[in-house]
């Protein structure tokens, strides 16, 4: 079973006695796990909720970009192993780091209310991207942001930026970069909002699918855990994220492709934007659709409509060329 959508589990007469949350050990990941832990403790005061901190391959490989070492799955495989062997009952993820298709045997049991999905401009010396002088070095961890920067600010130098949030800020503070681009949600969750000099407009820099949202993953057969997590699920966030992830999934989205998808509710309708770029930012394709979304099927249909429009503009040519180039580079590194 491979499910993107939480199923309505049976009502549990008996609350859980213990629950173990698998989490990466970075400060942001632990904040997210503690946020879920605290919510579960309020729901089930007698439950002993523990956190199992784990180091993933994605945390260990810091000298190469994710697109060159295996993509988003590097942040979740160890946590999924803990779910599979029973060491943990649930795993908490930043949804933008979760692969678009989960492995068989796993499911997203809940998607929590979203934080700010925007990208943040962080700098000690400059107020905005527009204020940066020619040749200024900007650090980013994603091809999506890199493509945006190369398209809109070709006079800037864009360099990779790896590591957890604190490591990235430390690299900025020691002068490795004039500015860095980070997800606003992580900064806000850790009380670092003062580090944000500007928030990037979603039209100029559409975020990654699921950015700002937390997803709770379980082993697919754990109907009991799904039912206990049901009160944490936010339906409006989930429908928006389902539409976004459908765009990325339909186009084979991964860390190797500069792909953005962002959905927002306006006047009862869901407005969805998808964008695919070449890594040099010279070709940028954008598609937008909106509609009344009441069910997951509606959300998936909206996502499919946006991906179809992008395909009609030639998005698959971009995706296939990038994937072929990545595979060729991988063979050369072996």
Swiss-Prot record:
Q: What class of enzyme is it?
A: transferase
Q: Which PROSITE patterns match?
A: PORPHOBILINOGEN_DEAM
Which cofactor names does the annotation list?
dipyrromethane
Manner of cofactor binding, per the entry note: Binds 1 dipyrromethane group covalently.
Q: List the GO terms this entry assigns under cellular component, sorted alphabetically.
A: cytoplasm
The record, for NCBIfam families, names: hemC
Recorded superkingdom: Bacteria
Organism ancestry: Bacteria, Pseudomonadati, Pseudomonadota, Betaproteobacteria, Burkholderiales
- Signal peptide from the UniProt entry: none
InterPro entries associated with the record: HemC (IPR000860), Porphobilin_deaminase_cofac_BS (IPR022419), Porphobilin_deaminase_N (IPR022417), Porphobilinogen_deaminase_C (IPR022418), Porphobilinogen_deaminase_C_sf (IPR036803)
User: Could you describe the subunit structure of this protein?
Assistant: Monomer.
Q: What does this protein do?
A: Tetrapolymerization of the monopyrrole PBG into the hydroxymethylbilane pre-uroporphyrinogen in several discrete steps.
What pathway annotation does it carry? Answer: Porphyrin-containing compound metabolism; protoporphyrin-IX biosynthesis; coproporphyrinogen-III from 5-aminolevulinate: step 2/4
Q: Which GO terms describe its biological process?
A: protoporphyrinogen IX biosynthetic process
This protein's record includes keyword Transferase: yes
Please give the name of this protein. Answer: Porphobilinogen deaminase
């Amino acid at each position: 079973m491979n499910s993107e959508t939480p199923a309505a589990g049976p009502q549990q007469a008996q609350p859980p006695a213990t629950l173990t949350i698998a989490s990466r050990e970075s400060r942001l990941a632990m904040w997210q796990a503690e946020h879920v832990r605290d919510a579960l403790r309020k729901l089930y005061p007698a439950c002993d909720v523990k956190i199992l901190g784990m180091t993933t391959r994605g945390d260990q490989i810091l000298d190469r970009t994710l697109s060159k070492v295996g993509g988003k799955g590097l942040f979740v495989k160890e946590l999924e192993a803990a779910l599979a062997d029973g060491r943990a009952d649930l795993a908490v993820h930043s949804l933008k780091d979760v692969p678009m298709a989960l492995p068989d045997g796993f499911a997203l049991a809940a998607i929590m209310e979203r934080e700010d999905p925007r990208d943040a401009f962080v700098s000690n010396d400059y107020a905005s991207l527009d204020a940066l002088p020619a040749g200024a070095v900007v650090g980013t961890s994603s091809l999506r942001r890199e493509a945006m920067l190369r398209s809109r600010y070709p006079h800037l130098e864009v360099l990779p930026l790896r590591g957890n949030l604190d490591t990235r800020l430390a690299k900025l503070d020691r002068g490795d970069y004039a500015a860095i681009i980070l997800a606003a949600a992580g900064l806000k969750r850790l009380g670092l909002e003062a580090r944000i000099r500007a928030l990037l407009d979603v039209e100029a820099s559409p975020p990654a699918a699921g950015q700002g949202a937390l997803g709770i993953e379980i082993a697919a057969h754990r109907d009991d855990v799904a039912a206990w997590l049901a009160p944490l699920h936010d339906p409006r966030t989930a429908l928006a994220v389902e539409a976004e992830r459908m765009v990325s999934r339909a186009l084979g989205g991964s860390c190797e492709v500069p792909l953005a998808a962002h959905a927002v509710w306006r006047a009862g309708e869901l407005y969805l934007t998808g964008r695919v770029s070449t890594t040099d930012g010279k070709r940028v394709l954008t598609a937008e659709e909106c509609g009344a979304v009441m069910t997951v099927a509606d959300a998936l249909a909206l996502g499919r409509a946006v991906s179809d429009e992008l395909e009609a503009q030639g998005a698959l040519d971009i995706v296939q060329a990038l994937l072929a180039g990545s595979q060729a580079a991988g063979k050369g590194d072996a």
